[in-house]
């Protein structure tokens, strides 16, 4: 009997063709994105640059495996190796943050926060979080988000005069509203959080205390930021941003009973099969963050942020709260007569990537804004130090001052000049060679 007949639906190239061969359009888009990352200064506070090892793990054959459930208790066979990966991720996360329990399965930051809500609240329950307009996050009760539609959010904010959270006002609001959950953390707050006081306030009204440390978890892991883990009932974080891992979420707690609730909330409550290739990449990133050089990295992120903030202040720019204690800052553009959207576009043309951002009590709409959010994790990863961030701060000031004098929000000659100097700077700090 002949065995030459083909009995497979896969083409001969299925297991051998490169991306360039199989899909040149997507390959071109990826190549273009690599070029952008190589030649632009990345200042978006929520972005970072992962290691080649993280990329390799995330692009591995673990993408093929379904593994509903948890290690040792799966609903599918053949999970012995993905169990190894997930157990490593769990144990490394626990060690990294000094937590008793960790769930590494959340696919995103939004889903990790939804899981906490599912575990601790009922629809219609009251909870407290920082107002989005003051630097909070969509999942902390924004009206357009599930958290604002299914639950009853009440928001604390910052003082108008200095842009800092008034803890006495937080305590008063908690006493008046008696929330079941109080959230600390946000996406655009540049100052330190008083976790001890927040826990005291939560205890005084019988509320759970949650910290969403998605933005500053890498600083916590590296010892450059106070840890909320000893104070909070639960901490959530994304695994990218300052933690420098793949995109995903993580839930931490020291309470075994709550850990069981969070596990059930993730699976089967919100998710089915976890993304095992991403979990493998999380494990790699956690191992990297456990190394001594990550402490140096975290320290440098904060030092670089302070240097960038001081450079901008010296150049005549106003910063919300006057500066930063972490990795990010908000530039108030109103004294310059500028809008966030126009400023963002001008800086992008000059190869400096950042994002427009609302500032506290912002009169502008979200797609316009009166501010810019700047962060230092990504450029610090590629090797920038204080001197480079001082240079970047001066380049930002050069572009913004130029467009402030322009009737159409553009300054082509200045933007082109800055772009060339950015290229010279980034060429000194190559990535993925």
UniProtKB/Swiss-Prot annotation:
Residues involved in (6S)-5,6,7,8-tetrahydrofolate binding: 132, 136-138
Q: Where does the entry annotate site (Plays an important role in substrate specificity)? A: 240
Q: Which reaction does it catalyse?
A: (6R)-5,10-methylene-5,6,7,8-tetrahydrofolate + glycine + H2O = (6S)-5,6,7,8-tetrahydrofolate + L-serine
Cofactors that this protein relies on: pyridoxal 5'-phosphate
Q: Name one Pfam family in it.
A: SHMT
- UniProt GO MF annotations: glycine hydroxymethyltransferase activity; pyridoxal phosphate binding
Q: What class of enzyme is it?
A: transferase
Residues with PTM N6-(pyridoxal phosphate)lysine? 241
The entry assigns this protein to a family as follows: Belongs to the SHMT family.
Name of the protein: Serine hydroxymethyltransferase
Source organism (scientific name): Rhodopseudomonas palustris (strain HaA2)
């Amino acid at each position: 009997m002949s065995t030459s007949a083909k009995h497979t639906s896969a083409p001969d190239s299925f297991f051998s063709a490169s991306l360039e061969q199989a899909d040149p359009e997507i390959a071109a888009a990826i190549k273009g994105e690599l070029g952008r990352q190589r030649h632009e200064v990345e200042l978006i506070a929520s972005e970072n640059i992962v290691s080649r090892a993280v990329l390799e793990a995330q692009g591995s054959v673990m993408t093929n495996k379904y593994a509903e459930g948890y290690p040792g208790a799966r609903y599918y066979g053949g999970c012995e190796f993905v169990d190894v990966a997930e157990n490593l991720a769990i144990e490394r996360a626990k060690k990294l943050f000094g937590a008793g329990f960790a769930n590494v399965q959340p696919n995103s930051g939004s889903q990790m926060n939804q899981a906490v809500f599912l575990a601790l609240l009922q629809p219609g329950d009251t909870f407290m979080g920082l107002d989005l307009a003051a630097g909070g996050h969509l999942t902390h009760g924004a009206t357009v988000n599930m958290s604002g539609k299914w639950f009853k959010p009440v928001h604390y904010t910052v003082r108008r005069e200095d842009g800092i959270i008034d803890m006495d006002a937080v305590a008063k609001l908690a006493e008046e509203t008696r929330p079941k959950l109080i959230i600390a953390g946000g996406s655009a707050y540049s100052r330190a959080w008083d976790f001890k006081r927040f826990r005291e306030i939560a205890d005084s009204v019988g509320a759970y205390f949650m910290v969403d440390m998605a933005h500053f978890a890498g600083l916590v892991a590296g010892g450059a930021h106070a840890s909320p883990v000893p104070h909070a009932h639960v901490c959530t974080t994304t695994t990218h941003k300052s933690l420098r891992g793949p995109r995903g979420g993580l839930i931490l707690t020291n309470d075994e009973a709550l850990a069981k609730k969070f596990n059930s909330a993730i699976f089967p409550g919100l998710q089915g099969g976890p993304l095992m290739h991403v979990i493998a990449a999380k494990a790699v990133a956690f191992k990297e963050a456990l190394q001594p050089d990550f402490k140096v990295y975290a320290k440098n992120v904060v030092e670089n942020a302070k240097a960038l903030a001081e450079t901008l202040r010296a150049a005549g720019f106003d910063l919300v709260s006057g500066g930063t204690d972490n990795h990010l800052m908000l530039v108030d553009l109103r004294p310059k007569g500028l809008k966030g959207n126009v400023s963002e576009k001008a800086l992008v043309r000059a190869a400096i990537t950042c994002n427009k951002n609302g500032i506290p009590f912002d009169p502008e709409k979200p797609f316009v804004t009166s501010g810019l959010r700047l962060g230092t994790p990504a450029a610090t990863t590629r090797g920038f130090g204080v001197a480079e961030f001082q240079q970047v701060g001066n380049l930002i000031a050069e572009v913004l001052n130029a467009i402030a004098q322009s009737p159409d929000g553009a300054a082509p000659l200045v933007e082109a000049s800055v772009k060339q100097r950015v290229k010279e700077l980034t060429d000194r700090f190559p990535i993925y060679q």
